[in-house]
Amino acid sequence: MSTEKINLDIHKILTLLPHRYPILLVDRVLELEPHKGIKALKNVSINEPFFQGHFPKRPVMPGVLILEALAQAAALLTFSEEQPKDPENTLYYFVGIDGARFKRVVEPGDQLILNVTFERYIRGIWKFKAVAEVDGKVAAEAELMCTVKTADAAP
């Protein structure tokens, strides 16, 4: 990502995503280049509710939540491409995942960097390549498929 860098703070993210505590997993957008990619940040705190049970003696962020954080970053990229006509009534559905791999654990105190690049859009389905990193090392990667629907429509 190089040309026009857009960054978004939590206040703007809250206007674009319907997620709220405890499932909002993007704290800031560091770079966003419409039609290309996004680089976002999740600060992983010991205060996250999932650490109570995963795992009490060795807290590790669940892999599915890393994937959810990547999907939320992809949603922010999608909404930069196509502004919803009715943002209050628009939902972003995660409809598929391919090639998910987990390479290292994510622990309290880590900064999870979420890199998502646009691959293609066909028949209402967005496809992205997504990589989550900690300290420059890959923590997780996957191809994500998503769609945008109104809240009253079935996914």
From Swiss-Prot:
EC number(s) per entry: 4.2.1.59
Catalytic site: 54
Cellular component, GO annotation: cytoplasm; membrane
Enzyme class: lyase
Keyword annotations from UniProtKB, A to Z: Cytoplasm, Lipid A biosynthesis, Lipid biosynthesis, Lipid metabolism, Lyase
Substrates-to-products reaction catalysed: a (3R)-hydroxyacyl-[ACP] = a (2E)-enoyl-[ACP] + H2O
Alphabetized CDD domains for the sequence: FabZ
Compartmental location: Cytoplasm
InterPro entries (alphabetical): FabA_FabZ, FabZ, HotDog_dom_sf
Chief localisation class: cytoplasm
One Gene Ontology molecular-function label: (3R)-hydroxyacyl-[acyl-carrier-protein] dehydratase activity
Regions crossing the membrane: none
GO biological process: fatty acid biosynthetic process; lipid A biosynthetic process
Assigned protein family: Belongs to the thioester dehydratase family. FabZ subfamily.
Function: Involved in unsaturated fatty acids biosynthesis. Catalyzes the dehydration of short chain beta-hydroxyacyl-ACPs and long chain saturated and unsaturated beta-hydroxyacyl-ACPs.
UniProt-listed HAMAP family: FabZ
Protein name: 3-hydroxyacyl-[acyl-carrier-protein] dehydratase FabZ
Species: Burkholderia multivorans (strain ATCC 17616 / 249)
